[in-house]
């Protein structure tokens, strides 16, 4: 099997620099007002900013209020749609595992970021490596205990969902 290596520096567009600079400015804004860590993000389609956000974990006491998720929520609310086809998400830093999950669910076309997750660990003390490591382990090996209970009841819920008319898949 041949390993494909992409040169992401060549995957950028002329307007990317403008929007990355804006994401970094949002990160400074949130950080300086004490809302959270040094992270900012934008959702852009066809040169128009649809949603933006900075990290608000501390200000909102919400561990999910990362810049990317705030920007996605704002864009989806304003678009009145839960997916971001044709959009680019610009981030001051490479998204963490939680944010990558949200980004994949939102289905944008691309992501552009300034610093890597390794940079965030080395220079800003935001180290997500333990999450990447945990996700590779079985449920039994993970640090946070996970127990399965009432599977049959859960399957009944899924059966009703499958039989529903008019549901919107995502």
State each model region's role.
Residues 61-65, 69-106:
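Helix-adjacent hinge/juxtasegments
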Residues 57, 91, 115:
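Residues that line or immediately flank small-molecule/substrate-binding pockets and catalytic motifs
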Residues 50-57:
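Short beta->alpha transition motifs characteristic of CBS
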Residues 13, 57-58:
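A short, polar/acidic, helix/strand-boundary loop motif
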Residues 35-39, 85:
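Short, basic and Ser/Thr-rich N-terminal targeting/leader segments
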Residues 38-47:
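Short beta-strand scaffold segments in enzyme catalytic cores
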Residues 1-32, 95, 102-170:
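Zinc-dependent deaminase
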């Amino acid at each position: 099997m041949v390993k494909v290596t992409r040169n992401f520096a060549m995957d950028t567009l002329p307007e990317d620099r403008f929007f990355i600079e804006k994401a970094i400015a949002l990160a400074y804004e949130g950080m300086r007002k004490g809302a959270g860590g040094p992270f900012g993000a934008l959702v852009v389609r066809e040169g128009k900013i649809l949603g933006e956000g900075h990290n608000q974990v501390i200000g909102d006491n919400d561990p999910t209020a990362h810049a990317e998720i705030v920007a996605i929520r704002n864009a989806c609310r304003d678009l009145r749609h839960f997916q971001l086809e044709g959009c680019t998400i610009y981030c001051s830093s490479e998204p963490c595992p939680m944010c990558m999950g949200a980004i994949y669910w939102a289905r944008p076309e691309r992501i552009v970021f300034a610093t890597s997750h390794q940079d965030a660990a080395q220079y800003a003390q935001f180290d997500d490596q333990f999450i990447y490591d945990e996700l590779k382990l079985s449920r039994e090996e993970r640090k946070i205990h996970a127990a399965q209970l009432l599977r049959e009841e859960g399957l009944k819920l899924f059966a009703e969902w499958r039989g529903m008319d008019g549901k919107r898949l995502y």
